[in-house]
């Protein structure tokens, strides 16, 4: 299982999340986006409808329509009702339930850096967990750990 820590320093979540979601779906995977905040989930739902004029990313909020049919599902908890094997943590709060997925994307900004460091360290000795740390550089994302 792979955990990718994305430290948002140059671009906000609203710019990074849609591109990651597009890439996951283009690669033939399903994605579960997790946030504890109902306001953030609603904002992400709106964002994925209109973040780029040329893009269309089918998705829904959990419970809004047929969850199992959604390539991208936005939910409060890491329960893959859409059969997702990839999870994206959008609220910056690490959840160990993400370890039940094939791959986890943990996005966080400066306000959540201490918690992200704690999660990074806690996962260091977990068997079967490969950690990657990504930071935003001048030329885009750079793997730093």
What are these regions (language model features)?
Residues 2-99, 107-112, 117, 136-145:
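Positively charged, polar, low-complexity stretches
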Residues 30, 129-130:
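Residue-level detector of anion-binding/catalytic polar loops
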Residues 126:
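Conserved functional acidic sites
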Residues 132-134:
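Conserved active-site loop/cleft motifs that coordinate metal ions or position small ligands
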